[in-house]
Amino acid sequence: MKKQLYCGSSCVKYILEKNLIDTDNIKSDMIWISELALSLKQNGLSNLHIYCYNSKLYTEFINAKINLSFDGFKYLKELENQNIQIVEKNISINSFASEIDNCKYMILCVESSVFNNDTSMVGGHYVILNGRKGNKVKVINPIKEKYEIKTLNINFLIKACKDYGAWRIIIMEEKR
């Protein structure tokens, strides 16, 4: 029986498969965006950028003595060790639109309750953004063993991510 993939692992799997990269060895239970970025890099996608804005986790990481037994800090430290830079970057409509336009894929961390319009949901969720037309963004949403593809308004996506640190991984086109 196949292990069910967490949404972050599903995002990594989707992007690796689209780049014709084997996905047999990816972790099924990745939850930290830094963990997703490390997996993408370890599997050959090195042209990555990581952005966040107003993230409590990142602020604590850069301003305090950190406890590396906490996975959130451990993976951020590993990004540092791998020379993957995290940039604090505000998320406005224009900057977000530009990020989407200038990348092949973006993995975005959204607040589940906002993204699904369901206040009973808690925690974060990862989705893939893949291009836009005007204010409409193509969203690939990993759900269990499949991917739901839909179009959402850019303002809605900003609303869904801004209170969760606006964490995003920008995956640029790889040179072949």
What are these model-predicted stretches?
Residues 2, 86, 147:
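Short, flexible active-site loop motifs that bind/organize anionic cofactors or intermediates
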Residues 7-10, 84, 129:
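Short hydrophobic/aromatic-rich motifs at helix boundaries and adjacent loops
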